[in-house]
């Protein structure tokens, strides 16, 4: 091939390559234009559709990597608009209690990362129910779980997770530093109250939607404490009860009215012969009913009922079916304190229906074992020990602990009444078992006007753990 032919050949090849490159560029421009046209056209359509948003989060914890996949269904038109929870409905008529949740936290914690907790409780907004709990700043089966039988420490915090889930670092939300707490939702935001600090100078920190709004200082300098269950919201105002003073004698008890995290009114109860601790409260036809723990001298439970102006009435559940623990055998009740085996106690609850009462109580008279619900049709006002219905939920051979009430508002359930519910703490570890830690799981039930069943839903963990050996 002579030089002229070489030049012609090279030129032809370059021309062909250039033409191909030009064609590819034109195709690329056309593709981009078509894609842009499709996206612009999609934005002009406003039809209702369901979207699924999948979020992937990588996090590392104790040299192990976890991938949390959160699949959130977003349904167009679903109401997430804030509403004011009215709280003016009456309690739903019920025949028994259906199992609602069980978190199995201790069983899962033998191998997984689960918080050491106590004092769990449940509270619901108009959109969801959450389990709140007081952590010990430690995980199960870890060295920092040692000594967590202690009630008050600077490591304790109020946290929350979706109801029915074991409380872990991966599904829990921090709420407040606290060794005593309560929380509730007014339809627009969460109110949390966390008490922390030294016994003689404790301070309650109020938060609304996570922002500090006010503080309340201990006024008797003797372990300021609150409910360990949900506060109550009615027509935009939330209500809670705090105690300050001795646990074995007369103390000071105050009701607080709170709006958007700010205290608008408070009163001190005039109750010199009563003792109110760890009250379990619920709304009923626009008023608030609280059933509490008498740690001083009553084996039946004291109650306080008040309206939105904090005008109140006080008393004790009259039934001879006694609700506290320890307690004597059922017998003759009293509308004042029943002094037999009245010292000490445990957090509990009851629901009033006219002259009748659903009494939730530990089955054992002397130790925190078993749990049962009893319907006494005249127990709010009469002192006999006859009852109509008994439903077992934890067997006498299994550990129980604190219990408390919570409600599901009509704005959540779609019912025209307030659904009564309760939770039971299932305490494991010290001081009754040979471990270095104390923690608990929980179960919960809601009232239904249909068939229910007797059974036992125990904690079920096999102890001791590896850390205990």
Curated annotation (Swiss-Prot):
GO terms for molecular function: exo-alpha-sialidase activity; metal ion binding. Residues 28-469 are virion surface. N-glycosylated. It holds the Pfam family Neur. GO terms for biological process: carbohydrate metabolic process; viral budding from plasma membrane. InterPro entries: Glyco_hydro_34 (IPR001860), Sialidase_Influenza_A/B (IPR033654), Sialidase_sf (IPR036278). GO terms for cellular component: host cell plasma membrane; membrane; virion membrane. Residues 11-33 are annotated as: Involved in apical transport and lipid raft association. Inhibited by the neuraminidase inhibitors zanamivir (Relenza) and oseltamivir (Tamiflu). These drugs interfere with the release of progeny virus from infected cells and are effective against all influenza strains. Resistance to neuraminidase inhibitors is quite rare. Belongs to the glycosyl hydrolase 34 family. Homotetramer. This is Neuraminidase.
